[in-house]
């Protein structure tokens, strides 16, 4: 079967640290998708492969009413929301709410002053997520570095 759709993109929020040590967040898109099967007998699918690294996967349930006061992500990590909603507030004052199917890269290590970000559940249900922590060196001043 021939796939005739155009090359996809996938939006994500990037929580990062600027050159002054302030955490910020902006919305970007993964866009380096290639149409390729994962093996010779499998139909092609769109894949955007990241640089190989060691990773740890954690399935997380944030309880109803949970708030994580100012803290940094322990490592650069991809966070995918499965159910429920949560917020992330960065040091620049920006607050973003995310829900099922939304993706975030948490890379706010090395902030100054208030630490990193605040986060918590929103609404009347817990927030479930899958967190993939990468064994990579965090960057500073490189918003949207994931393509």
Language-model regions: role of each:
Residues 2-17:
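Short acidic, Pro/Gly- and aromatic-enriched capping/linker segments at domain boundaries
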Residues 105-109, 117-139:
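A short hydrophobic beta-strand segment most commonly corresponding to one strand
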Residues 91-110:
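Short acidic-glycine-tyrosine-enriched beta hairpin
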Residues 74-92:
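Glycine- and acidic-residue-biased ligand/ion/polar-headgroup-sensing regions
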Residues 25-28, 89, 98:
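Short capping micro-motif at the N-terminus of alpha-helices
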Residues 17-70, 76, 126-127, 132-135:
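A short glycine-rich, His/Asp/Glu-containing loop-to-beta-strand
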Residues 68, 85-89, 103:
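Short beta-strand segments in beta-sandwich/barrel cores
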